Every structure is written in structure tokens, then in C-alpha cells.
Amino acid sequence: AKGGPTPSIAVLQDLDAEDTGFGCFWGEVQSNIHKGLGGVGVITDGGIRDIPDWADGFNALAGSIVPSHAHVHLAGFGQTVRIAGMVVKSGDIIHADQHGAVVVPEEAIAKIPAACDLLQRKEAVILDLAKAPGFTFEKLKEAIAKQDEIH
């Protein structure tokens, strides 16, 4: 958000225990407020609503989509939260996309490009064969063995 690290992602834990996602904090209003403050998205185990009316380009990963906001209130800010098993502290670096989210340890950031390159090269061995005519289980076993030679 403006005045803080950017881009920023709001991370909101729903504290309603067995009723998580019954109502929601996030909809048209919150998406516009947070985008206006420099935010790029929200991650919550709670519900979201009003999706067609959200701020353009504002992203969300949520536990559910619901029709109403119900009774919501903020219980704290800048605290450690737990979202679907992921523990997030204020200031953590998060990678998120349509598949989910993960906290990235600061010491791992510099290693990410090399790890992605290695993974891509290893997967290419199998993908190229799997997409080619005549792919068999035997060819898959050969590809897996070739993967082990890539470093």
C-alpha cells in the first residue's frame, strides 16, 4: 500500500471458525479501497463477493464466493495469520497465482531463477516426448532417467 512496500497483497484470516466464509469482508468496496492504496490483491480463507464490480485488475484468492457481507469487523492489523495452512507474517514475500499462494523465505529469493530454469529443462524432457507421436510407457521411463542427468 502507499507508504509501505509495493506491490502489496492484503492477507485476511476469517476468524469465524466453523462458519468461515459465511459472510465476507471483500467485495467491490474493499477491492477499490485497497487498489487505490496501491494494493494488487487479497488472499483470504474467507469469502468474497461482487466480483464483476471489483477494481479492474485487482486479484483474489479466497476460500469461497458468497452473496452477502454479513457482520464483519477487523480484529487486528499487521498480525501473523493462518490462511488454509499458510502462516503469513506482516512483510512476508508471497508468490500467488490462480493455483494458490506460498510464502517465499527471503533467503530463497535469489535462488528462484535458477530453480525455475532447472525445473523447466527437466520438465521439457517429458513434455516433448509426451506430446510426440508414439509416446509409450517405455519412453516415459527413458525420459525420467534423462531428467536425472540434468543439473
Predicted regions and their residues:
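Feature captures the catalytic cores and cofactor-binding loops of soluble hydro-lyases/lyases
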Residues: 1-90, 104-151
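Channel- or pocket-lining gating/hinge segments that regulate access to a cavity or pore
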Residues: 100-102
